[in-house]
Amino acid sequence: MKSALLFTLVVAAVHAQSPQVISPAPRRESNEIDCPEYCLDVYDPVGDGEGNTYSNECYMKRAKCHNETTPPAWKDLVLITGSSTGEQPPSKKCSTVCPDVELPVCGSNRVRYGNPCELRIAACEHPELNIVEDSGKACVGSKVTPQEG
């Protein structure tokens, strides 16, 4: 009885892996746009040039694909990214929205920001301050004018 059950399971497993049972993935045209149904919750914020910020590029693509008022035209899409090294995004429009994630960082201006995204917004809005992430300085809860010296 056990060998019959084992044989049935093996046959079912082999049949399930058979190329005749598994249909090939449909081929996409070269001009067809990638419209993901699901995205990983990975925090790597991007902006779309219209002031919208998304958790990552996948969520941005998904939003653009499902927004019927905005046809997805990836050729005209400008990604806005920043970094904690003071690099400015390629657009003059600064993002204003950050995910509600508590991951405190200290800026070179001695201001404590709730997360790296908030630091990037401050750096974008005040490029003259050249704000970057700085773990070597003491951070405070409110803005402190740096000591001149």
From Swiss-Prot:
Disulphide bridges: C35-C65, C39-C58, C94-C124, C98-C117, C106-C139
Glycosylated residue positions: N67
Keyword Cytoplasm: no
Assigned GO CC terms: extracellular region; host apoplast
Pfam families in alphabetical order: Kazal_2
Induction details: Expressed during host infection with the highest mRNA levels 3 days post-inoculation. EPI1 and its host target P69B are concurrently expressed during infection of tomato by P.infestans.
Signal sequence residues: 1-16
Domain Kazal-like: 29-86, 88-141
Domain of life where this protein originates: Eukaryota
Gene3D superfamilies documented for this protein: 3.30.60.30
Site residues, Reactive bond: D41, V42, D100, V101
Role played: Secreted effector that interacts with and inhibits the pathogenesis-related P69B subtilisin-like serine protease of host tomato. Inhibition of host proteases by a pathogen extracellular protease inhibitor forms a specific type of defense-counterdefense mechanism between plants and microbial pathogens.
Binding partners and assembly: Interacts with host subtilisin-like protease P69B.
Protein name as annotated: Extracellular protease inhibitor 1
Organism: Phytophthora infestans (strain T30-4)
